[in-house]
Amino acid sequence: MKKGILSGLKVLDLSRMLSGPYCTMMLADHGAEVIKIESPTGDTSRKTGPFKIEDYEKKWSGYFVSLNRNKKSIVIDLKSEDGKKKFLSLVEKADVVVENFRPGVMDKLGLGFNKLKEINSRLVYAAISGFGNPQFGKSPYTYWPSYDVVAQAMGGVIGITGPDKNTPTKVGPGIGDIFSGLMMSFGIISAIRIAEKTSKGQFIDLSMYDAVLSLCERIIYQYDFDKTIPKPEGNGHPLLVPFGIYKSKDGHIALGIVDNSFWKVLTNIIGNKELTENQKYKTIESRQHNAKSLNSIIESWTRTKTNKELGCLLGGYVPFGPLNTAVEIFKDSHVKKRSMIRKVEIPFNDKIKPWRVAGNPLNFSEFPQPDFKSAPSLGENNKDNIFEHKSEVFKKSKSSKLRKAFGSFATGVTLVTTRQENGTPRGFTANSFTSVSLDPPLLLVCISKNAQSY
């Protein structure tokens, strides 16, 4: 069985629906042991659909399967005393707890971060909510419930999406949830890095509103710099032209001309003298001011050719791509070669065909992506010996006296420092280290794997 880059990381996942499960999916895909802790009725997404035709009992929602592959499931009633005891026994051996309740819910259960860190001082506690935890700034909306569409609306993305200002449009995928989950996965790995060094965990807070606002960063600087209120641009760009979606003979294509070098290539391919000779289209700024007429000329050309023909003319020369539906994506050789659609077998139900889910886009040269395992049935791992051993992450990082003094670094790296009283450089070879924290900074010289201390 291939091990992922996060193998040994132990995660307790209390989250539901999309934001938290997407976060822990990213971790599980790369080898973390993620234990999904569910109420007796299970995650709501189990019932959301869609369902395969042969799944007569509707036990396997596509929504749930996609986000919860590679995870385990146990049922714990956190409102019961017995459930709390079970949960706390798992916390003792875990590295991370993830939840996406409203602020205060876990505290009311007696299971908030302050309680959990008494049991496990190195625990990383990750909390995603609509408007964030009050300790980092009390929002007037702190206790409002929130889902993706609310975050998209308040964070700014809907305000700049759609054909015009009178038709605000939600972005298709749940980016308010997904981007929040993705950001939190980064936060977790960052906090784990510190916990490995200091054995001290911490609380990570992420507001979905904040995450979407950071995604819409340009509306901040545009308004601040010249009081422009960014508005929906349809399929175009407020500053760059041509940049957007254009009709073709049999569909649509995307073009993204950012600088003049690509503009020259495009105009040579199109062969329209109006584009090459008219001063209105010479510079990025002039093209922006004449966007309507320019887009009309571009589309009058693209509409005469099929997507395949445009691919032959433009592909590899300018930023170009066809507009793909699910049908085209499933057929695309890029997707196949990059393993971006993964097959997941169902070992305990041969009546249901294997699922296919979106792959994980991260690739590591030293850690091939692990095989995807099935999403768990509700409480599938109740009888398993969950977290039989304490964290492998911290077991590997126990400090020797040398590590306490010098941190750790790669095998066979010689460290050279001027800490001798007479200023003469002294070196030693690091044989089992992963990080160094010294003052003054060290000059690092890789001599050889057999270099000796001197």
Task: Annotate each PLM feature.
Residues 1-197, 373, 377, 383-390:
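N-terminal helix-loop segment corresponding to the beta1-alpha1 unit
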Residues 2, 350-393:
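Flexible, small-/acidic-enriched active-site or ligand-binding loops
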Residues 64, 233-238, 243-244, 352-355, ...:
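Short Gly/Pro-enriched turn/cap motifs at secondary-structure boundaries
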Residues 133-134, 165-175, 196-212, 231-238, ...:
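Conserved Rossmann-fold dehydrogenase catalytic segment
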Residues 181-201, 214-225, 267-274:
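Oxidoreductase and adenylate-handling cofactor-binding alpha/beta cores
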Residues 236, 241-323:
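Aromatic-enriched alpha-helical interface/lid elements that frame and gate functional surfaces
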Residues 315-368:
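A glycine-rich dinucleotide-binding beta-alpha-beta segment and adjacent secondary-structure elements
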Residues 393-454:
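N-terminal structural module
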